[in-house]
């Protein structure tokens, strides 16, 4: 298994030199029989008590620290520290099986919630083990000894050289065992900002597929297609009967070339369209443009004549209407005069009748 661990919390742990992530690799306690530890790749080693006295100690060798004898017991430990990492959290449970693991990093509370072994053996969950970190950064915190169940789980994981995950909610500690019987502990200090989970790189989100379109979008798309003008209808109206015969050979030639190209593949279809005879295609296009311009001029001229006739007819209609109104007005005036004359004549006749009757 790869020893490197990548944890994403919004900022990459390998992008900055002042990370809150520390790596502690404690080699097997059996190396103490040889009488000393081998040298690491940096200058941040030393006794844990010496590390506590220097709160700003950093390693110059990158991810690998110095190696020395710690606690006077001949146990070899490899320490890797970064800035402001000087607190030791020894896990006594692993020390009983020949391994000493120390977790270095700032913090005020640490809780080991569960230990699980992933392998051919069944999964074993242990009880919570709590440890309190002193407020003083130089304080040393000792974790309470684990139960017999925890020891069995850790011993089984060490013997099988499998992965043991120690879940710590505040610090997210993960322990890996390597083929060399070394334990790598990566202590992650919780960030002060909310974590973001990146999506899987293999996950595909099709955006242009037909399935991703909703019913409203599909209906709107179909309505737009139905509202689009029919270019074939416009072409037939403009071209007329003479152009229909001329346009058919060109469309047949393009259709035949497309069918031939489709049998050979999509690229062949595109190449066949591009390999058409330019003289054949351009000749039809030129004739189409010439006839189209003549037909357009003819239609424009006919439209102008029709509009002129309509204007003249409307003008004549308005003139006749005015004349008719004038005739009606004159006739009304004549009839009024005649009515007055008849009324006067009637009066005179009545007077004459009255006079003759009296006589």
Swiss-Prot record:
Xref: InterPro entries: bZIP, bZIP_sf, CREB1-like_pKID, Leuzip_CREB
Its principal location? nucleus
Q: Which residues form the bZIP domain?
A: 300-359
Q: Which UniProt keywords apply?
A: Activator, DNA-binding, Nucleus, Phosphoprotein, Transcription, Transcription regulation
Phosphoprotein found in the keyword field: yes
Task: Give the residue ranges for region: Leucine-zipper.
Answer: 328-349
Provide the residue span(s) of the region labelled Disordered: 1-73, 185-238
List, for all copies, the residue spans of the domain called KID: 198-257
Biased-composition ranges for Gly residues? 33-47
- Bias class Low complexity marks the residues at 9-32, 48-70
Asked if the keyword Heme belongs to this entry, the reply reads no
**What biological function has been recorded for the protein in this entry?**
Isoform E is a PKA-dependent transcriptional activator. Isoform J is a direct antagonist of activation by isoform E in cell culture. Binds the cAMP response element (CRE) (consensus: 5'-GTGACGT[AC][AG]-3'), a sequence present in many viral and cellular promoters. Has a role in long-term memory.
| Protein name as catalogued | Cyclic AMP response element-binding protein B
Q: What species was this sequence derived from?
A: Drosophila melanogaster (Fruit fly)
Annotated gene: CrebB
């Amino acid at each position: 298994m790869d020893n490197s661990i990548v944890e994403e919390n919004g900022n990459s742990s390998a992008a900055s030199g002042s990370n809150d992530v520390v790596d502690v690799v404690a080699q097997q306690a059996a190396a103490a029989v040889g009488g000393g530890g081998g040298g690491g790749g940096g200058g941040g080693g030393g006794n844990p008590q010496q590390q506590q006295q220097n709160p700003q100690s950093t390693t110059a060798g990158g991810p690998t620290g110095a190696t020395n004898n710690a606690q006077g017991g001949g146990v070899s430990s490899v320490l890797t520290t970064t800035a402001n990492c000087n607190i030791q959290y020894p896990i006594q449970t692993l020390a009983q099986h020949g391994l000493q693991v120390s977790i270095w990093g700032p913090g005020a509370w640490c809780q080991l919630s569960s230990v699980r072994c992933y392998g051919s053996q069944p999964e074993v969950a242990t009880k919570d083990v709590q440890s309190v970190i002193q407020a003083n950064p130089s304080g040393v915190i000792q974790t309470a000894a684990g139960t017999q169940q925890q020891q069995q789980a850790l011993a089984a994981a060490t013997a099988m050289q499998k992965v043991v995950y120690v879940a710590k909610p505040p610090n997210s500690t993960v322990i890996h065992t390597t083929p060399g019987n070394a334990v790598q502990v990566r202590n992650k200090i919780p960030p002060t900002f909310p974590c973001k989970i990146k999506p899987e790189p293999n996950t595909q989100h099709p955006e242009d597929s037909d399935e991703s379109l909703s019913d409203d979008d599909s209906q709107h798309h179909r309505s737009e297609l139905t509202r689009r003008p029919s270019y074939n209808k416009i072409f037939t109206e403009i071209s007329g009967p003479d152009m229909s015969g001329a346009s058919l050979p060109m469309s047949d030639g393009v259709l035949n070339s497309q069918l031939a190209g489709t049998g050979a593949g999509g690229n062949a279809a595109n190449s066949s369209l591009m390999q058409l005879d330019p003289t054949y295609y351009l000749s039809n296009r030129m004739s189409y443009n010439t006839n189209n311009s003549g037909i357009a001029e003819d239609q424009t001229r006919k439209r102008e004549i029709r509009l002129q006739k309509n204007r003249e007819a409307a003008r004549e209609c308005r003139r006749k209407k005015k004349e008719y109104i004038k005739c009606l007005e004159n006739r009304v005036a004549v009839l009024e005069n005649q009515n007055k004359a008849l009324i006067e004549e009637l009066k005179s006749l009545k007077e004459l009748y009255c006079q003759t009757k009296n006589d």
